[in-house]
Amino acid sequence: MPLIKEKTYTIDDIYALPEDERAELIDGQIYYMAPPTRKHQDISMELSSQIKAYVRSKGGQCKVYAAPFAVYLDEAANTYVEPDISVICDKNKLTDKGCKGAPDWIIEIVSPASRRMDYYTKLFKY
């Protein structure tokens, strides 16, 4: 029996999704994401605010972004992720659409549902 070939998706497929649908693209496969919980958002906003304030207090030029913020991890257009928090110090990585290449620092707020994806799948892509 022949093997069934999975479809390989691209960033264009991600952009074709309905606006209210959150997903990431890893090695050409789409992974849909549930909306974050209120607790998740509280943690994300507090960390983002603290990091941004620290960077400013030290006169740093790094930029701090909270999800949704696009990170394109390869030139082949088949890996697109949205870390919960991204810190980018190399301005050459920033485009109008997001960050090309791995941010200088990422933070993933891990929940039981996202543990495998955050600790394994995405970690090895960064």
Q: What positions do the PLM features span?
A:
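Gly/Pro/Ser/Thr-rich low-complexity, intrinsically disordered segments predominantly at protein N-termini
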Residues: 1-125
